[in-house]
Amino acid sequence: MFSNQYIQQRIHKANSLREEGKNPYKNGLKRSLTNAAFLEKYAYVKDLEGPKDKEKCESIVGRVKLLRLMGKACFIKIEDESAILQAYVSQNELNDEFKSLKKHLEVGDIVLVKGFPFATKTGELSIHALEFHILSKTIVPLPEKFHGLSDIELRYRQRYLDLIVNPSVKDVFKKRSLIVSSVRKFFEMEGFLEVETPMMHPIPGGANARPFITYHNALEIERYLRIAPELYLKRLIVGGFEAVFEINRNFRNEGMDHSHNPEFTMIEFYWAYHTYEDLIELSKRLFDYLLKTLNLDSKIIYNDMEVDFNQTSVISYLDALETIGGISKEILEKEDKLLAYLLEQGIKVEPNLTHGKLLAEAFDRFVEHQLIHPTFVTEYPIEISPLARRNDSNPNIADRFELFIAGKEIANGFSELNDPLDQLERFKNQVAEKEKGDEEAQYMDEDYVWALAHGMPPTAGQGIGIDRLVMLLTGAKSIKDVILFPAMRPVKNDFNIESEE
């Protein structure tokens, strides 16, 4: 694993430190300031030739990013999470320790410097070293940079290298953290209670998706990694909670692309005595809050598209298919005509698809990618909404919406089905679809139906994909760019590939 010549050279230097009585993985030394705090505290220091106040001694830590040796002195760029700070190390102060430093120190090593502030002749605030310690000897040379597409997979597989080399990547994940904490704060301010529900389910449910299956040895039964927390959260509404939310992982055993990862983060929230129309207004307030928190304008650029949050609109499913998708009502209303139309357009359609699923195929193909500004699409076909409340005026549609931004689904919400008999029939229909070969159809969950039978108040519920939300608000083009360790196909690692030194 460590046979590479450059790695061997570094291992030799680590052993050489041990021979000098120095631990190359020293512990217990503390910094007094972050690099950013040092730069802020001593910003007034400008004069190299003026008196140096060695009493103002600080300790800083970080990774060596640049090393310039110049005889009896050297300049070192040291980076911690907050900033890069230059250190000046001279043989005059360190004596024999300076010789050891020159012999052993390399780019990538993690160090501690204790010293006083001063400014170079160019006016750069630096730390003048009085002590220097290697805290962690890096034995694998770091890459200087990544070279575009050829290294994208390496960035995802070895995210730690990506974070070391590309500061902008770290910024994305800091912004992700801010987005998640802001979403949490928003719902707390709205009066919602954060809860946690099981990650392993006896029956997969809450969404149309294929589950991951595992096995519980003690109980001797199969368990399913959750595809959605929905049915457990609605059990809490039955139990008397009136506004709950959960931010956590879901797992779906399906394909991967630039907007899908099998392990992803969602927020789901449920609100008793409210309707899906209330959720639409709540969603608008949420985005207003996020844009203000992140100091973003109401117009943002994503994938070369201008998204204007001031142009938020609401449109029904069929109207969107007609006015945006360009399909006439005559075709949309007849199952046989719609099937023929899709086939004429070269769309491969699975046999025995229901009218509602044919409409969904048409929507995915002709409408979704055109929804650039925030668009709430309402009145979904009941056949593709097995957990949503049936509309009072039209039993063929559900009181449901999905939010699309920049051509992608961001949220899904609806007034919840709380009629246990209707829910039982919907589950039976889903089971029939599964028996016909639909792997994504939902399972029968009699325990959930039994919970509904105890009475669930009128409730509205919604899910928002956090990863896609972060993509939108950071401009990331792939979901892998906003997940620290995305799912990747396993490869045999060659840890001895020659590195540029």
Curated annotation (Swiss-Prot):
CDD domains: LysRS_core, LysRS_N. GO terms for biological process: lysyl-tRNA aminoacylation. It is found in: Cytoplasm. The keyword Metal-binding applies. It catalyses: tRNA(Lys) + L-lysine + ATP = L-lysyl-tRNA(Lys) + AMP + diphosphate. It is an enzyme of class 6 (ligase). Keywords: Aminoacyl-tRNA synthetase, ATP-binding, Cytoplasm, Ligase, Magnesium, Metal-binding, Nucleotide-binding, Protein biosynthesis. Mg(2+) 2 binds at E409. Its cofactor is Mg(2+). GO terms for molecular function: ATP binding; lysine-tRNA ligase activity; magnesium ion binding; tRNA binding. Gene3D superfamilies: Bira Bifunctional Protein, Domain 2, Nucleic acid-binding proteins. Its main location: cytoplasm. Binds 3 Mg(2+) ions per subunit. GO terms for cellular component: cytosol. The keyword Transmembrane does not apply. HAMAP family: Lys_tRNA_synth_class2. Homodimer. Belongs to the class-II aminoacyl-tRNA synthetase family. This is Lysine--tRNA ligase. The gene is lysS.
